[in-house]
Amino acid sequence: SMTGFPTSADIYLEMDGRKVAVVQSYTAKASKTSQSVEAFGESEPVATIEGQKRYTLELTRLYATDNAVSDGINFYDMANFSLVICKPDRRVIYSDCQWSGIEEDGRLNAMVAEKVTVVAAKRIETSA
């Protein structure tokens, strides 16, 4: 593979400290709620308060690891997991993840999911 591009082993899901699936590719989208502060007698809001951030991740082609398979973990059982992305210079971790959608391909076995949509509460970056 070309250098600098993540291979599937560089993107994985971790649950209870164990690697449960490798992910072929992902896209990430961050959104944030905000709230206007109104003041009596003012026609415009006086301030905007930053709300909570939320990260939506679209994961493509997930393969359950042998560990997960032997533990009987499937994609539907996963909760409070992390998505770990290893880049040459840093590591990005999305934590407190929950899945919000799972797409399976009927021809693939239960150990592979075509697309999983995940919502994460936190995103941290650490140097490699």
Task: For each feature predicted by the language model, list its residue ranges.
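Solvent-exposed edge beta-strands and adjacent loop segments
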Residues: 1-63, 88-115, 128
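Short beta-strands and strand-coil junctions in structured, solvent-facing domains, enriched
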Residues: 65-69, 126
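Short, acidic/charged, Gly/Pro-enriched secondary-structure junctions
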Residues: 69-95
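Hydrophobic lipid-interacting interfaces of membrane-associated proteins
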Residues: 119-126
